């Protein structure tokens, strides 16, 4: 597994969460995220392990409504276990965001850390 392949799977996962909150996306969590997964958004820690991710995503989905992910860039770092992804998140209830995220992959090929920054798109 390369970090860029993992980044693409992450964006597909986000797209699925944005489309529906059925159990299909829940099955993807242990395959994509390490048990010690950490999620940070705009400097705020949102999840300190994989088991907290489902609730965090459901809470965001309730507030934001459905959303669509449009991938813009995937840039590998010199370290082969890290990359930057940039995408647009267009939500039904909270508007559109230009998002930049640094993903870190663990030895097992799973996302260990996600540091996201959201910038609202003003149209």
Where are these regions (language model features)?
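Short histidine/acidic/glycine/proline-rich micro-motifs that form metal-
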Residues: 16-17, 43-46, 90
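Compositionally biased, intrinsically disordered low-complexity segments
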Residues: 6, 20, 47, 72, ...
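Short acidic-aromatic low-complexity motifs
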Residues: 1-35
């Amino acid at each position: 597994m390369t970090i860029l392949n993992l980044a693409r799977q992450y964006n597909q996962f986000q797209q699925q969460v944005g489309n529906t909150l059925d159990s299909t996306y829940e099955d993807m969590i242990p395959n994509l995220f390490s048990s010690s997964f950490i999620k940070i958004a705009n400097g705020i820690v949102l999840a300190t392990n994989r088991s907290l991710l489902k609730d965090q995503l459901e809470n965001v989905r309730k507030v934001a409504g459905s959303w669509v992910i449009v991938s813009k860039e995937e840039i590998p770092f010199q370290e082969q276990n890290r990359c930057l992804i940039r995408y647009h998140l267009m939500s039904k209830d909270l508007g559109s965001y230009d998002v930049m995220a640094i993903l870190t992959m663990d030895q097992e090929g799973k996302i260990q850390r996600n540091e996201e920054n959201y910038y609202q798109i003003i149209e």
